[in-house]
Amino acid sequence: MNRIMGIDYGLKRIGIAITDFLRITASPFDTVKNVSLKKNALKILEIAKNRDVSIIVLGLPLNMNGTEGGMAETVRKFIEKIKFLSDIEVTTVDERLTTVQAERMLIEEADISREKRKGIKDKVVAALILQTYLDIQSDE
């Protein structure tokens, strides 16, 4: 069984998480710099190929009322670019409050300083996005 990749697509950084081969746990993997839609998509697809990923799950940033804001449009453009370059399956999950949850985890549970959180937060958010997807799949 191939792995699943979770992505937190941000304006400056892209957080990446990957499951184990059994698709049970989501683990933070890496954070890459956001360069351009095409370069970002190529980098993600390269990692996906090297890590035997068959599904990519992106967090879709929704407003608290459930509507899509400007960043959701950017995420959808990124999805279009990935689909243009590859036939890998791409899906989304609601990522509302995952950044807040990650911040809280890193401060309260891991006691990580603000400076160190910058480099870790994005991939932790990606892991939360991916775990949300896994939880939804296990409920179906």
Swiss-Prot record:
Pfam families: RuvX. It is an enzyme of class 3 (hydrolase). It is found in: Cytoplasm. GO terms for biological process: rRNA 5'-end processing. GO terms for molecular function: nuclease activity. Keywords: Cytoplasm, Hydrolase, Nuclease, Ribosome biogenesis. InterPro entries: RNaseH-like_sf (IPR012337), YqgF (IPR005227), YqgF/RNaseH-like_dom (IPR006641), YqgF/RNaseH-like_dom_sf (IPR037027). GO terms for cellular component: cytosol. Its EC number is 3.1.-.-. Gene3D superfamilies: YqgF/RNase H-like domain. Disulfide bonds: none annotated. Its main location: cytoplasm. It comes from the Bacteria. Coiled coil: none annotated. Could be a nuclease involved in processing of the 5'-end of pre-16S rRNA. Belongs to the YqgF nuclease family. This is Putative pre-16S rRNA nuclease. The lineage of its organism: Bacteria, Pseudomonadati, Elusimicrobiota, Endomicrobiia, Endomicrobiales.
